[in-house]
């Protein structure tokens, strides 16, 4: 099933939807200035709040989400019918069925319901599009028929246009990402293609934050950082640690193979020695 039928400018299809899977690779769209102006007129009082399990929505990224909770189903249908933006937040513990404020991370993203898909297995998948505004939950105002909250919008702090350090870090981040993606397979080819076609470093950070298989906790940590340069540094740090872990794993596997080969060689030699000794012993008896 294609995860996205709406076709905005500069979008890249990455993968198929998978229920409650944190490694879903979402569609990415570069959002126009109209998106930002819509957020400026957004009513931040009583904003409908959709809680996600093990998933973090980033500004400028669209993701498919399987929706099963009664409150969530009602929320997305109301939001689609009224063309109302919603607040999308990751919950701290995916096992909590009816999360309250303490069960949610404080920072989320203003989202839009792009499409609701009724699946053949009778489940519901919604395509969420992240707007270019993050928010912080101030107060929960309602819990029925679904959660609403008063929120404060938070701006993204962009680096200076001539920040050479930022440019160098973007280049290093791309190189590191390509290196990490080498062993993923066909999906990596599509992801590499998408990355190569993203010109905006701001969007690149959000795209990678959503696509790279980090934990929900790590992704939330990235989302919470308002300064894009600092977010980029943190993402690079996380990917560097991942690269180091992969190298350690590869070294262990290589050492294990060498040890096994050595054991096999020694075992073979011991068998040969025993065979020769047996033959010599037999000859002496003759």
What does each model-identified segment do?
Residues 1-286:
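N-terminal low-complexity, acidic/polar interaction/targeting segments
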């Amino acid at each position: 099933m294609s995860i996205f039928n709406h076709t905005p400018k500069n979008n890249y299809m990455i993968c198929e939807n998978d229920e409650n899977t944190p490694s879903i690779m979402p569609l990415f769209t570069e959002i126009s200035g109209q998106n930002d102006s819509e957020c400026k007129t957004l009513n931040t009082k009583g904003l409908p709040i959709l809680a996600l399990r093990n998933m973090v929505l980033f500004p400028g990224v669209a993701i498919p989400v399987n929706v099963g909770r009664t409150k969530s189903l009602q929320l997305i249908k109301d939001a689609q019918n009224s063309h109302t933006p919603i607040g999308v937040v990751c919950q701290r513990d995916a096992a909590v069925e009816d999360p309250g404020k303490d069960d949610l991370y404080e920072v989320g993203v203003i989202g839009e319901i792009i499409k609701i898909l009724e699946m053949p297995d009778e489940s519901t998948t919604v395509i969420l599009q992240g707007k270019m505004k993050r928010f912080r939950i101030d107060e929960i105002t309602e819990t029925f028929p679904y959660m609403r909250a008063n929120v404060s919008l938070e701006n993204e702090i962009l680096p200076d246009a001539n920040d050479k350090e930022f440019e160098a870090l973007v280049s290093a981040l791309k190189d590191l990402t390509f290196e990490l993606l080498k062993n993923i397979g066909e999906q990596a080819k599509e992801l590499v293609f998408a990355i190569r076609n993203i010109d905006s470093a701001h969007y690149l950070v959000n795209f990678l934050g959503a696509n790279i298989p980090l934990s929900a906790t790590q992704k939330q940590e990235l989302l919470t950082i308002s300064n894009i340069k600092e977010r980029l540094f943190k993402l690079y740090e996380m990917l560097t640690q991942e690269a180091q872990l992969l190298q350690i794993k590869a070294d262990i596997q290589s050492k294990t193979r060498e040890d096994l080969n050595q054991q096999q060689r020694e075992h073979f030699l011991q068998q040969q020695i025993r065979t020769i000794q047996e033959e010599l012993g037999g000859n002496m008896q003759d």
